[in-house]
Every structure is written in C-alpha cells, then in structure tokens.
Amino acid sequence: MKSLSLILSALAVQVAVAQTPDKAKEQHPKLETYRCTKASGCKKQTNYIVADAGIHGIRQKNGAGCGDWGQKPNATACPDEASCAKNCILSGMDSNAYKNAGITTSGNKLRLQQLINNQLVSPRVYLLEENKKKYEMLHLTGTEFSFDVEMEKLPCGMNGALYLSEMPQDGGKSTSRNSKAGAYYGAGYCDAQCYVTPFINGVGNIKGQGVCCNELDIWEANSRATHIAPHPCSKPGLYGCTGDECGSSGICDKAGCGWNHNRINVTDFYGRGKQYKVDSTRKFTVTSQFVANKQGDLIELHRHYIQDNKVIESAVVNISGPPKINFINDKYCAATGANEYMRLGGTKQMGDAMSRGMVLAMSVWWSEGDFMAWLDQGVAGPCDATEGDPKNIVKVQPNPEVTFSNIRIGEIGSTSSVKAPAYPGPHRL
C-alpha cells in the first residue's frame, strides 16, 4: 500500500544500511518476550532490540553521507563494493543514542517515539536473538502471535507498525567479505516494496537494485484505523531486482491482500471511545492466528482482540462481493481484487516464507507524501484529507508514539489466559 513518497518522508532520518562499524559501543535495549504452549503456558525469553542500520549514523570519514534512500550509494565513496566498505562508517549506539532515536524498552515493553525534542526520528527496529549477533527468526505458519498495544497517541496520519520481513538472519554478513555490519547493527532490511537503497545485504548497491523480500504486515494502524496485509514475493529471501521485476507487476505483491474493518463497511468496530467495539484510547491485545492445513500450508489469517478481559472477534464482511467471513483467505483476496497477490501464489506463498523464518520489525512513522490516506481516509477510515498532514498531526498530538508490549508466540490457543475460539468467527475447520 505504501508509495515511494510515503517512505521517503518517513525514512529521511534513516540513510540506509551502512558498512564498516566504528569503535563506538553498541548497547542493544533488552526486551522480554514469551513462548507459549497450551500445556505449559507462556515462558519468558530474553531478546534484544536493534535499530535499523540507517539510524546508526552513516558517514564518510570527512563527514559526508554515503547515499540516500531511493538511490544508489554516493559514487565518490562507493565506486565499487570494496571501496564502499572502506569509506562508509557506521556508528555504534549506546543507551543514550537509542533514547535520542526514540527507542526505549522496559521489561516486555517497547516504546517508539516519532519526535524527540521536536526533531523527527521515526525509528524502525528489529528483534535480535539473545546473543545479539543474529535476528530472531519467527516461524509463524500454524501458530498464534499476540501483543499488547497502546495507540492513544497516534492520531490520523500516523502509523505504528508491527510486521515481518524475510531478512537474512545474519543481516547479510555472510553474503560478502564487504558486508561488515550484520544483524548486530541492524543491516539487511528488505520488504515487498522493492525500494532501491544505497546498500543491499550490507554491501554497496553499486547496480542500484531494488531490495525485495516477502513481507507480512500484521499491524499497521493508528487510533482511527487498522490494516493487515500479507505481501508475498516469487523469490525466497532477500532479492535484488532490476527493471520490471521491481514494478507493480514484478516479483513482489506491493499492494497486498488487505483487511481493514472500515473497508468492509464495519465502521463501528475500531476507534477512539467506548462507542467502538475496540476502544483505541486504551490498551488492548491483538491476536493473529495463522491457520495451516494438514500439509502445513498457510490457508487463513484470523484476528481477534482482547480488551477488558473480553474477546472481540473480527467482524464479518459487510460489502457485496467477498464471502461473508471474518478472516483472510484466497477466496476473500480474489474477491477483493488482490490480483497480484493471487498471481504470486497467494496465501500459500506467504506461508512458505513464514515457514522459512521472518524477522520481526516495529516502527512508527508519518507520511508527508499522502498523509497516510490509504490507511485512514475515505473508505479506509474517518480522517479527512488534511488531518494526516504532519503539520496538523503535531497540533493534535505534539508527541506521537506507540508502545508494543507482552509479545507472545505459540501454538494456536496458547498465548492468552482469556478463552477464545480456536478459529474465531462463524467459520470452523
């Protein structure tokens, strides 16, 4: 759903994946997560958070930059991959640097702030293993994923996102001797939008390739609207595209198969206040169930919420065309016009990437390009054409932020003490 203009504004502070780390100490924020089974409940696990490599501060030795998002690397610094690795320096981030980038943790809570002292930071972070050297690879086909979220400070035009990317577990460090940063410094980002970035797998992107991989948007939302969308690609892992491969009919589904309650004409489901089934001004739990068949193929994506200790099932489709269900499957996607999704293999293709393993990414951002219209304007939500303008966002909320907490992963039906249907809604397997 996201256009290049959207991403350019959101990532202006994130230059790109950098190269050789300097001697500044990296101090990853600790984050407690949980792994759950029906038999034993949820057990705490230690993870760490790393900021995207572009947030670390990327520069040449003379202080000049090494390239901007949407472009090849600086030609002077990066005439070839080896020179790029030598000339482009990445700075480690200590605890104060993380705070100044709008990233703080406490126990199982992760807080992401859009502004620090009125300066745009718009952080994006990834989940590391306890050893901090590799990303935690999540294998979610046939499982359940839950988290708590606080959305009150995200008005129209904001996006607090939690999603999966099929990034390389080591951040691309093993792909080349010129890849120096790795997962430890947040390298190796990719998604289904296939944007050109100065570095690919942590190596100078001399050819100017688009950086593609499978993407599953579990949660893109503000306090007015929510969005779920799987984005499959025809190639496994991180792939450098060229030409038409990078386009809207290329190797990745850029639009995805989306679910937004407003778009299915259930406008009283989610919003600010007690008149909505899910009140976004108070903390709530988001539970996603990735249902597989006996062959292990992903066939459905289910969602329910928990607030005030009560399960709130997703509403059933209330528009003509799609089947009257409350989850995503191939029939729903085909009926809603997700043609690229179906062409690229649909739900099974997304599940194949989830089975191989994907990295958890979390971010907060706004869009100076279209004010996040695709998320919360028109049929997508109640926001008007200008509410999402960053100049207006700060008038409503001077300090936009989101807090994700209590991340729990396990077999279906295991991540909450509140009893919920194994497969929410009228449909049963």
Swiss-Prot record:
The modification Pyrrolidone carboxylic acid is found at Q19. One of its GO terms (molecular function) is cellulase activity. It comes from the Eukaryota. It is an enzyme of class 3 (hydrolase). The active site is at E215, E220. Disulfide bonds join C36-C42, C66-C88, C78-C84, C156-C383, C190-C213, C194-C212, C233-C252, C241-C246, C257-C333. Keywords: Carbohydrate metabolism, Cellulose degradation, Disulfide bond, Glycoprotein, Glycosidase, Hydrolase, Polysaccharide degradation, Pyrrolidone carboxylic acid, Signal. It catalyses: Endohydrolysis of (1->4)-beta-D-glucosidic linkages in cellulose, lichenin and cereal beta-D-glucans. This is Endoglucanase type C.
